[in-house]
Amino acid sequence: MALDIIQAGPLSLLQDLGRYGYQDVGVTPGGAMDTHAFHWANQLLNNPANAAQIEITMGPFKACFKQSTSFALCGADVVATLNGNKITSWSSSQAKAGDVLEMGYPKQGLRSYLAVSGGFTSPKTFGSISTVIRNKLGGLSKKGSKLANGDILPFIAQVQPHLRKVPQQFIPEYKDIINIGVLTTYQFHQFSEEAKKTFFNELYTVTPEIDRMGYRLKGKPIEYAEQSFVSEGIALGAIQIPANGQPIILMRDRQTIGGYPKMGCVCNRDLNILAQATPGTQIRFFEQDLYEAEAELHQEQHYFFKGNGDGND
């Protein structure tokens, strides 16, 4: 009752929704970069909302099912096959013992999520399976290691009686230009009006310097007069403005404190879109209404968590 990894690709990680309550001692939450895709993959299989999955960055990826099960694939637009027969993303499928799943490079997007019925099982570290390489925590080894060829991931074999697919209106398009909503917090009101105008009116480009810790952007520099700050806690999606004026958006594996001035935070909805952005993608920022963002988040949490547990217990 396991999945045998034949080709892990450059970065495949066991992830759940992350570990919380330890940022005060320098432990980042980690967790799935694109929670929209993650949630839907579990939802398709009637899994607990926090059931562990494999986050596959880029690909290629190849694995063999050692036991019959239902599985789901959500996220990047990628060609995937089961025993050479094409399968559809954002839907559930069934595999028999010995079936081989193969995935190529994404046509659009960056990260795919592979879920199995019941979730992958592995010992927790600080309450989570999530892999954080920089903290050497979680994953199959409990030491923050990415998945490797030959790894065997256990799961409880379950076959769902019905195949399901995500309604089309909930499947995102990964575009070359994306609009990112910003909650204007932190030092936003200390920036000059000219700096704010630059931030919201200019296009910024995703550079090749992106990882699970943060996304570095390039565009017209944003000026900030103050040079020294006391380090403070870093929220998910915080937009730092370092000395060169080029924004850095901090992601799931971010450091827990930092001293750069910050324009605010990317709203949860658009962090998922950003997590799928590849180098060269252009970003246009806009000011996101706080109450609207809260309502969207509460609606999402109500749908995915209601009666569905927190998983991996």
Language-model regions, residue ranges each:
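Conserved "landmark" site that anchors the functional core of diverse proteins
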Residues: 1-313
